[in-house]
Every structure is written in structure tokens, then in C-alpha cells.
Amino acid sequence: RTLTQGVEEPLEQARRFYDYITLNVKYAYSRAYFCLEDIPDACARNLRGDCGMMALLFITLCRCAGIPARWESGWKAEPGFCGAHDWAQFYAAPYGWLYADPSFGCGAAREGNEARRQHYFGNLDPFRMAANTQFQADFDVPMDHWRADPYDNQVGEMELRDRALEYGEFLRSKEVLECTEVS
């Protein structure tokens, strides 16, 4: 309530949440999510978290304020680089669903780039490939065994008849083959 005290407009409330996270939370790689009892709470209490933890904290704060918010994750893919990444969406009438990327905003704040920090509230860069629109979503083809990453899988999984394979048991790779500007 303190973050949104005196603010009724959902867009401005969401901005306050984004500002709080990007200006106070430090990026840090996390333990496996199954080791954390409450992921957004861990991020809020420790003021540290990875991209998924920051996105979940933003989503949780929005939802607590009555602002619809949801998860999106996939890859950040640009010439020469491809890596897993998580971000959020929130709903603000009359604009509809908007993006927020607290961890990229946090990185911009750390670098002193306020324009870029502001950009990641309401916008994303064009180098995204969305793979998941829900946190802890089931696969379209259900697995018969325990999943390696039941929280946020962006790279796929494999299983045999008698067990699932762990990530170190099969080869996987990703590569940006082409980046083309479209108009």
C-alpha cells in the first residue's frame, strides 16, 4: 500500500511497482526455483533476484493492487546472442496489455541509463521470442515423468519410457540463424 499511496490510476500504480523493483532489487542468479518456498516473496525480502523472480514480483504486486498481470518468457535473440529470459505483461485501460521487463530495467538503472530503464516499462525491444505465456505451464504433449524444469521451461525436455532425462544427459543448443528487419 505504501508504494501506491495516493495513486488510483492502474498504469501509474504499475509504474510505481516497476520503479521500486528496478531501483531497489539487484540482479542475482537464483537457486533452482523448487528450492524457494515463495519466489516473489524471496525477491522482495532479499532485494535480489533473477529475471524470473523480478517478473514474478512485479506480477504479484500488480495483482495485489487489482491490476491484471501475467507471465511471458522465452528467448532474448539478437545477432550473435540467444539466451533464456523472463518478463511480464500487465493490463492498463485504455491501452490494453503492456510489457514490463524489470530485470532489463534494473540493468539499465545500474548502468545509469534512465531512458532505457523507462523504455522497459510499457515496451520491449524487438529481439524476443516468446515461448511461455504462463508460469508453471504444462507442456502441450504431457510428460509421463518428473520434469527437469516445471516452472519455466524455454529449451525443452526429453524422457525415455522409464524416466525423464536430466539436462546433462542430452545435447541441446540454440543459435540465431538470421535477423532481418521487417517493415
Summary of predicted features, one role per range:
Residues 122-183:
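Low-complexity, Gly/Ser/Thr/Pro-rich intrinsically disordered linker/tail segments
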Residues 1-46, 158-182:
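Secondary-structure boundary elements
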Residues 38-42, 83, 109, 152:
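Short, surface-exposed, charged/polar-biased interaction segments
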Residues 17-20, 27-29, 33, 58, ...:
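Sequence-level detector for tyrosine residue identity
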